[in-house]
Amino acid sequence: MTPHTHVRGPGDILQLTMAFYGSRALISAVELDLFTLLAGKPLPLGELCERAGIHPRGARDFLDALVALGLLEREGEDTYRNSPAADRHLDRRKPGYVGGYARLADTKLFPVWARLTEALRTGEKQVPSQGGFFGGYADPEAARGFLGAMDAVNGGVGHSLAGALDWTEYSSFVDLGGARGNLAAHLHRAHPHLRATCFDLPEMEPFFQEHMKSLETTDQVRFAGGDFFTDPLPRADVFIVGHILHYFGLRQREALIARIHQALTPGGAVLVYDRMIDDDRRSAALSLLGSLNMLLTSDEGREYTPAECVRWLSDAGFTDVRTTAVSGPDTLAIGRKPR
């Protein structure tokens, strides 16, 4: 997102106003399965349109727009291939696939963001109280779509977490709110000596078991069901808390951090990552907009600054607290429990 200092005139303002054009083009390309069709080999315009079901009228403009956006490459006049990034992350058969988030944007984010003005006037979330943002687990296919989108959001963080600590000092970790276990499985693969636990609501367990089977990690990551605030947390050397704190108000954040401190073994560590806002609150536009997303989708949630996170961890008794940038817009805070 362009910082305000780069908005110099009406052209920049209009470009910002029309920024959703590119987002919508990407979402349509994912819906048409375009990047999976192009995985492995380029296709000429006519064959690509036939296989993707694209009408000739808008085809060339659509595909060339994706070229201009860096998602496709064109050879000659009418042969298209995936860009390297699209081939890695938008082919649904690849492990780095993030297209699930594009589908979530289409079905959930676009409609709820249309109610931003109402949220700003009332201070109230704009999703149903029952079922929340994605509607709960009653519809398994909808739930899988949402969980796939969350895997996409968290996918890039796994590599950073694998190198964030000297993991030889630890024997176990809990991914708090770890959903279907995607990040926990990634971290266990990087450090097989670790005992891995995914802690989430009991309703998540069938999706967890299904995903672990697909990753062939059924015996490597265990599931523990419960509520963050009322059920006992598993004992572990490390707790991972990713994209969790931003969903709650200050009192609940502080209570959860205190519970984590209590559950950690002496000498253990907590890893907190979120789309934290820069301390000056001037340049992290995506994180600030993400905070508005929490306004739209939660009762009290918002994004927060690294300085706030350091203060909460320190107040709970963690020492040697530090922060560092990780994948994408995320910032990681690390704190240690004294021995």
UniProtKB/Swiss-Prot annotation:
One of its GO terms (molecular function) is O-methyltransferase activity. Keywords: Antibiotic biosynthesis, Methyltransferase, S-adenosyl-L-methionine, Transferase. The keyword S-adenosyl-L-methionine applies. Its EC number is 2.1.1.-. It is an enzyme of class 2 (transferase). The active site is at H246 (proton acceptor). CDD domains: AdoMet_MTases. It comes from the Bacteria. One of its GO terms (biological process) is antibiotic biosynthetic process. Pathway: Antibiotic biosynthesis; tetracenomycin C biosynthesis. Pfam families: Dimerisation, Methyltransf_2. InterPro entries: COMT-like, O_MeTrfase_dom, Plant_O-MeTrfase_dimerisation, SAM-dependent_MTases_sf, WH-like_DNA-bd_sf, WH_DNA-bd_sf. SUPFAM superfamilies: S-adenosyl-L-methionine-dependent methyltransferases, Winged helix' DNA-binding domain. Disulfide bonds: none annotated. Coiled coil: none annotated. Belongs to the class I-like SAM-binding methyltransferase superfamily. Cation-independent O-methyltransferase family. This is Tetracenomycin polyketide synthesis 8-O-methyl transferase TcmO. The gene is tcmO.
